[in-house]
């Protein structure tokens, strides 16, 4: 299973952060209470979510403004859509991201 390790301090607070590793683009987000990661692609028009912005626990896609709950990945505008999460492990200093190895990551974006 592919993974990548980061220092927690590498991930900015309340700002989407892009990680590219082993052919996968991921968006990592850290709030005061948690750190989450998803595939870096909006399920609506496949814009990179790492180029979006976070306000009040919501990530806004830079393409067409779709909004996603940072904690759950669920789309606020169209609840049938959600982001594809990757596993995040943290010891308070370091972060490890795990994901399934897929041929076409964007193919499974829709829930």
Regions found by a protein language model. Give the residues of each.
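N-terminal pre-ligand scaffold of iron-sulfur
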Residues: 1-56, 84-111
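Short cysteine/histidine-rich metal-coordination sites, predominantly Zn2+-binding motifs
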Residues: 56-62, 75-84
């Amino acid at each position: 299973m592919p993974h990548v390790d980061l220092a927690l301090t590498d991930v900015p607070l309340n700002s989407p952060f892009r990680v590219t590793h082993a052919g996968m683009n991921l968006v990592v987000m850290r709030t005061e209470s948690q750190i989450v990661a998803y595939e870096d692609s909006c399920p609506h028009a496949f814009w990179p979510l790492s180029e979006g912005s976070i306000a009040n626990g919501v990530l806004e896609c830079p393409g067409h403004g779709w909004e996603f709950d940072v904690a759950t990945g669920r789309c606020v505008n169209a609840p049938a859509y959600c982001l594809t999460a990757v596993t995040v492990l943290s010891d308070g200093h370091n972060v490890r991201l795990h994901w399934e190895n897929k041929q076409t990551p964007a193919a499974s974006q829709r829930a």
